[in-house]
UniProtKB/Swiss-Prot annotation:
GO MF term set: DNA binding
GO biological process, one term: regulation of DNA-templated transcription
Coiled-coil residue spans: none
Gene Ontology CC terms: cytosol
Pfam family, one: TACO1_YebC_N
Stored PANTHER family: TRANSCRIPTIONAL REGULATORY PROTEIN YEBC-RELATED, TRANSLATIONAL ACTIVATOR OF CYTOCHROME C OXIDASE 1
Keywords of this entry: Cytoplasm, DNA-binding, Transcription, Transcription regulation
Annotated protein name in UniProt: Probable transcriptional regulatory protein Cbei_4222
UniProt cross-references to InterPro entries, sorted A to Z: Integrase-like_N, TACO1_YebC-like_2nd/3rd_dom, TACO1_YebC_N, Transcrip_reg_TACO1-like, Transcrip_reg_TACO1-like_dom3, YebC-like
Main location: cytoplasm
Organism: Clostridium beijerinckii (strain ATCC 51743 / NCIMB 8052)
Family: Belongs to the TACO1 family.
Domain of life of the native organism: Bacteria
Length: 245
């Protein structure tokens, strides 16, 4: 089966600066706080927390760090007041961009996100201006190594996955949001580890950008990734072949 994820071309550009700056654990920690606040610290009954923990493990967050984050979240609930705010807009060449934030100061986050759009050659738009170009999907990325493609495909599809794609170095499993946990847990039960596992916004189509616009857009992504309020950035840019900055 063939998918439309283009994971290496699209998602890898977004996430590498998080890892480089050591911010990804902090961002996931905020998601843990919100998951615990909304559903409690027991993973057996809190599906959202299970999903966030899976995302943390895929990002190589140590188990001890995850446990401490959950424990810390349980003790901080009365003082936690993060607000989930989603911004939409356009990058160079009309690239569609969605920015998800968890913030305790929406004026700060709005100003920072708007600045990143402007400095990256784009502009922030109104709510709904680009979200119709995306679909919410679960996405599980698995490194190929020596894994049996047919076996993995059957496990994923039997558990309810919508699609199974073979890309250059990875397999990408796509699910409906409500089936994400079931499919992920079916793969985990077989000892499969993930490069990435989360529910995200996946574009219906992609916009090819040239090298000049790629440089501008990468600046926007770097600024957004470096913002503590920004949790996720989704876009439909297709970078030039071989682009890696």
């Amino acid at each position: 089966m063939s998918g439309h994820s283009k994971w290496h071309n699209i998602q890898a550009k977004k996430g590498k600066t998080d890892a480089k700056r050591g911010k990804i654990f902090t961002k996931i920690g905020k998601e843990i706080v919100m998951a615990v606040k909304n559903g409690g610290a027991n993973q057996d009954i809190n599906a959202k927390l299970r999903d966030v923990v899976a995302k943390a493990k895929a990002a190589n967050m140590p188990n001890d760090t995850i446990s401490k984050a959950i424990k810390k979240a349980s003790g901080e609930l009365s003082s936690v007041n993060y607000e989930n705010i989603v911004y939409e807009g356009y990058g160079p060449s009309g690239v569609a961009v969605i920015v998800e934030t968890l913030t305790d100061n929406k004026n700060r986050s709005a100003g920072n996100v708007r600045s990143a759009f402007t400095k990256g050659g784009g502009n922030m738009g109104t709510s709904g201006c680009v979200s119709f170009m995306f679909q919410e999907k679960g996405e599980i990325v698995i490194e190929k190594e020596d894994k049996d493609e047919d076996e993995l495909m059957m496990i994923a599809l039997d558990a309810g996955a919508e699609d199974f794609a073979s890309e250059e170095e990875v397999f990408v499993v796509t699910t409906a949001p409500e089936e994400f946990g079931t499919v992920r847990e079916a793969l985990e039960a077989q000892g499969i580890e993930f490069l990435e596992a989360s529910v995200k916004m996946i574009p219906d189509t992609y916009t090819a950008i040239d090298e000049a616009d790629a440089k501008k857009f990468q600046k926007m992504l770097d600024l957004l990734d470096d913002d503590d309020d920004v949790q996720e950035v989704y876009h439909n840019a297709e970078f030039p072949e071989g682009w890696d900055e």
